[in-house]
């Protein structure tokens, strides 16, 4: 289960709903684990219909101020997993596909607010993503098969993200324009220190170099420790910038003397285990960003999100506690690892193409052909028509897979992503024609140059 919150008593009238949700989640999990075949979209649609039925029942039996129970946790688990299935079958623009995206954006915004170490550049892509989701919800709600309860649920989740974004935006909008450059630089240094704390031996000269940068920023303050404008008037945003600067000095000392983990963290097997789990998750997600086009089924991300949610739920008032119930110093590194893991999940979700996994192999091959042709074009073009033969043969072999202009699945159904794949195919043919035309033009210019030279002789 992805959500790990204290269980509240489930009302008697919601018990049947809980049992149904547990059953749906188990079937989704079984489908997720089955790697022997491609995911069939009709199975996903059927499970979605069953889930919507339970959402309608729950919505009809609840008031707006109902206490959150395990029913909500099970529902969110089902919705997040269902959302990943929609991405896996290429239905990226259908409403259920946005549940997991909204959940990830919310997490990132919460971590930004908690750490108070972010810039406008961090918020901008999240805001753009929220606006795209908002537009998709509006468009999706107009369709005949749109479920009102799904639209309502998505709008509620969107509203939470909007509130978090507004708070995050308000916090940095108070920074004076003259201080924005310093704040941006401090945030960058802070993240470099966090990264170094995780890999303390990766750059032996990092500590001295970073200390010099921090001292340089420290010297920009006046004798009263304030960042001021040309008229010696203290700039707005002092507290935020000074807070980040002090944290940078403190964390750099920790990284210098304690190799990333504080003594208190090192003395707690429980916290060391959390650290190593997060570090392992980060490395796996980082690897996925390099290989996902060929190896990732979007539903695989559920396991990572579940692990992160479990770890995050261990915090009490934002702090991880050791075996004695104390919150040791030096926990910033754990928050950094959590945030980085969610950032990689967000990156993987954002890069998901609206193509069914049945078509993904063809899609990836066409992307590779296109990338190779573009590289040939950038490198000066072809030397002869023969240079194009391998690309033409590859395109021909892929085109031969089509039946009546469609790429079919093993059961002869038409998988999602036809337009995108056919568009890539067309682009590859256009690039071949461009390369051929460029070669032809080059030959003409070369002949004309040769004739002019002969004439002058």
From Swiss-Prot:
Keywords: Coiled coil, Cytoplasm, Nucleus. Disulfide bonds: none annotated. Pfam families: DUF2408. It is found in: Cytoplasm; Nucleus. It comes from the Eukaryota. The keyword Nuclease does not apply. GO terms for cellular component: cytosol; nucleus. Residues 119-174, 418-448 form a coiled coil. Involved in bleomycin tolerance with links to DNA repair and/or proteasome function. Belongs to the CUB1 family. This is CUB1 family protein C30C2.08. It comes from Schizosaccharomyces pombe (strain 972 / ATCC 24843) (Fission yeast).
